[in-house]
């Protein structure tokens, strides 16, 4: 598995949601983990722990949504598109509908909006231009809120455990609050050996501005959220907003939950909720072969062993003016089959114009890498130019295997050389495609 640090760094480059709570470098960062559940799933789980959430139900058709609204028997309704991405409220559907969260006053309204959401693609600032297809909508009761606040529990590497993070400015982009008004962010580190303490939750409840009569209720909800976080091996429990309603209730209006994939064996029921249709299919495919893959936006594919070397390879590609198309770590002991599948995966990305293979053989043997590359090239007739830099165990055997293969592999002896060749080739291929030209490369470059 990727380390949290590597995942955080890579996913930040994908413009995924991350939170830095200090002006300077902070260790308080959360990121998308292996499992991220839908809002309706999150609220169902939370309710079983006594956490207050709005009444609601999920629908997969406009007719189901209408029936749910009829049963709720109220004119104060909300229909929410269910996608694993933030920014729904300001998103745009391929149907032309603006906003993935719509207020409704009747069951007919709910059906109308559900029909414009279900089966359509929602594009938000977090989905990228491809967006995500909506397969469910969540129909809930609407509440009139007296005050909206932000509350989260996440893992803090610096503190060595969980920390509660809260702000009186909820219902908005919390990253913007942290950037523009860091004094509005409050933190309470938790000693995992004794758990969250009443004085901690009271301090936060008072700083958030709960009315005096609701301080104890807010404390109770914070304690239950912490219990949920610990018992389910969460990496993030985010409530935005945590609200005080006009009727005097304390409600978790919207929830984002992430679970530690390393604890999947302890929570099979939770991990069955994984919605692969909302994930990058390349990442799903990579997981089948125990490959650590994260798709990016560039045009230079990367196949590397070791997360640190992979990060360095991506950095040097950027240094020479290129842009990596992915992070792919085959690990320290990959098989020929894994290498073959890694090459297939990278080459399946139409944006990729060149591929950099950078292997330092320790436990991983260079000849295994060479055999995997050749197998993939022969099986798929891959035309994408490959720049291969190998060093370490069995490197001479690997070079001979590649020379004897008769395939047009571009060799490099050091990382600078490999990166420069990869960037140059990607530029040439991109220009040729724009000009509708066919090109070939004469070796050595």
From Swiss-Prot:
It is an enzyme of class 6 (ligase). The gene is scsC. ATP binds at residues 80, 87-89. This is Succinate--CoA ligase [ADP-forming] subunit beta, mitochondrial. GO terms for molecular function: ATP binding; magnesium ion binding; succinate-CoA ligase (ADP-forming) activity. ATP-specific succinyl-CoA synthetase functions in the citric acid cycle (TCA), coupling the hydrolysis of succinyl-CoA to the synthesis of ATP and thus represents the only step of substrate-level phosphorylation in the TCA. The beta subunit provides nucleotide specificity of the enzyme and binds the substrate succinate, while the binding sites for coenzyme A and phosphate are found in the alpha subunit. Belongs to the succinate/malate CoA ligase beta subunit family. ATP-specific subunit beta subfamily. Mg(2+) binds at residues 240, 254. InterPro entries: ATP-grasp (IPR011761), ATP-grasp_succ-CoA_synth-type (IPR013650), ATP_grasp_subdomain_1 (IPR013815), Succ-CoA_synthase_bsu_CS (IPR017866), SUCC_ACL_C (IPR005811), Succ_CoA_betaA_euk (IPR034723), Succ_CoA_ligase-like_bsu (IPR005809), Succinyl-CoA_synth-like (IPR016102). Residues 43-270 form the ATP-grasp domain. Residues 1-17 form a transit peptide.
